[in-house]
Regions:
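Type IV pilin-like appendage domain
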Residues: 73-146
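Short, ordered beta-strand-loop transition motifs
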Residues: 68-73, 96-97, 152-156
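Calcium-binding acidic motifs and repeat modules
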Residues: 35, 71, 102-106, 154-157
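Generic detector of solvent-exposed, compositionally biased contiguous segments
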Residues: 46-67, 127-147
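Aliphatic-rich helix starts adjacent to a transmembrane/signal segment
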Residues: 1-60, 189
Length: 189
């Protein structure tokens, strides 16, 4: 084997090795992106289920306030006993950048219960949320299932639609949506 043949063989081996390495690296990266998207979807789905549970159980505040405090496209504040202590916590779900966060405020009990002006530290319940101004997280409906404009008065709200668009890489992957309807049980008609 001459030196020229040896160099050609080494060159071919190097090119083939690099090609195989690049091929497997791209497959790994693709599978990693799919795995990340799957994890984000699972977390978002769990967040929607937890939101549904707490919204469904909304009730009158310990202070006597109506069960819904405020309702807009990306922010929903209501009262619910999410920790099963027989006290109605003030709950706020909202979009902060690409994260859904939850805040709660425990009632200050006494002869005239009140709620503090400041919530406890926010908890991130979902990440990689890609909702835009035209894709609200919260949509509201009345008794006849007619949509309500937002922000809306809390009193006609009977049904809430929660929609999350999830995307781990907005430059490459299209949004995947998770949507659910919640009927508030404790609303007097």
């Amino acid at each position: 084997m001459s030196l020229t043949e040896l160099l050609v063989a080494m060159f071919i081996f190097t090119v083939v090795s690099m090609g195989i390495s690049i091929f497997f690296a791209n497959i790994w990266k693709s599978k990693y992106n799919e795995l990340e998207m799957g994890k984000s979807l699972l977390i978002a789905s769990q967040a929607v289920n937890n939101m549904k549970k707490s919204i469904r159980q909304a009730g009158q505040a310990d202070s006597g306030a109506y069960l819904i405090s405020s309702a807009s496209n990306f922010d929903f504040v209501f009262y619910s006993d999410i920790d099963n202590d027989n006290d109605m916590e003030k709950i706020r779900y909202y979009l902060d950048g690409s994260e859904i966060k939850m805040e709660k405020a425990e009632p200050i009990l006494g002869t005239n219960p009140t709620y503090p002006d400041v919530y406890e530290a926010p908890v991130t319940i979902a990440k990689d949320i890609a909702n835009t101004e035209t894709e609200p997280i919260f949509s509201y409906f009345d008794n006849d299932y007619d949509p309500l404009a937002t922000p809306t008065s809390a009193y006609p709200i009977r049904l809430i639609k929660i929609t999350l668009y999830v995307n781990t890489d907005p430059n490459k992957i299209s949004d995947v949506s998770i949507s659910s309807l919640v009927y508030i049980r404790n609303v007097n008609n």
